[in-house]
A protein has these predicted regions:
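Short linear motifs in intrinsically disordered/low-complexity regions
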Residues: 7-10, 51, 64-65
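Intrinsic disorder/low-complexity detector
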Residues: 8-11, 76, 80, 146, ...
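Catalytic-core environment of secreted peptidases
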Residues: 57-83, 139
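Glycine- and acidic-residue-enriched helix-capping/strand-helix junction motifs
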Residues: 80-93
Length: 277
């Protein structure tokens, strides 16, 4: 009859799904949980802690003036890579502009790895010259290259590898360099622009910085043999017209020098000067 309900149908309606009150309760729980999570993240960010509750790493640097060595990676009879520009010319221009910025800043004592850009010096010889000056930080400036027809471009840098005395400090400095270059418009290669290099005899193996295992193979000579935190930077591809226009031309080298200078300031915790080049 139309006026009577079927008990079986009523039971089905009661058991067919959660009530509105239950759904609302679940939604409230989800919202509360999400709010608590974001408040926790904000608290960590405000306190400077990471998700494990630990303070983020900061190098212990002491008081200024800080001794910073700049290494032009090629020079003399060693031209480095050739392309749109010659690597040794680009590294010399960048090094000179960076040294000028450091010389103008009383927080720093700039040091050089070679007597002149026309001097030929092996990495082992430069490492010895660097150590003799007792630096607190080393930046080795290089340019990258690729075979003809390759579209390879971008910035990458190589800190002292895991397990070495100055690895954590070097990695921290590498982060400042990569972040600065990205902000300047460079494409970052690899994981965040940071990679490791190992040599197995004459064979070079590139490893992403996510691989943190300690290995016995040596990395770049300068990174292995200097007694301070060190990073080797490949500021752009000398074989890429676009890269060179942005970061390897005369003005591009000045741009990169400024990025490197500000990364050094970030490492030591000083305020960069507005020094024009």
């Amino acid at each position: 009859m139309a006026g009577r309900s079927n008990p079986r149908h009523a039971r089905w309606r009661r058991q067919g799904g959660p009530s509105a009150a239950t759904v609302i309760g679940l939604l409230v729980c989800v919202v509360c949980f999400s709010a608590a999570f974001f408040l926790w993240k904000a608290a960590l960010s405000g306190s400077g802690r990471n998700e494990s509750g630990e303070e983020p790493f900061r190098p212990v640097v002491g008081d200024p003036p800080y001794r910073v060595c700049i290494d032009a990676g090629h020079g003399g009879s060693d031209p480095g890579a050739r392309g749109v520009v010659e690597e040794k010319e680009m590294t010399a221009q960048t090094s000179e502009a960076l040294l000028a910025l450091l010389e103008a800043d009383p927080n720093y004592i700039p040091l050089r790895s070679r007597e002149s850009y026309d001097a030929t010096a092996k990495p082992s010889e430069r490492a010895g010259a660097i150590n003799a000056q007792i630096p607190q930080l080393l930046l080795s400036i290089h340019g990258n290259s690729a075979p003809e027809g390759s579209a390879a471009a971008g910035f990458e840098c190589y800190p002292s590898v895991p397990g070495r005395t100055w690895h954590r400090e070097s990695y921290y400095f590498a982060q400042q360099l990569a972040q600065g270059m990205q902000a300047a418009g460079a494409k970052l290669r690899g994981h965040g622009g940071i990679r490791y290099i190992y040599y197995q005899g004459e064979v070079k193996q590139l490893v992403e910085s996510t691989h943190t295992e300690v290995r016995d193979e040596r990395s770049f000579t300068l990174l292995e043999d200097v007694n301070c935190p060190a990073v080797l930077a490949e500021q752009c591809f000398v074989t890429s017209e676009e890269d060179v226009a942005q970061f390897g031309s005369e003005e591009g080298c000045k741009t990169v020098a400024r990025v490197y200078y500000e990364a050094i300031c970030a490492y030591f915790g000083t305020q960069p000067l507005d020094t024009p080049l």
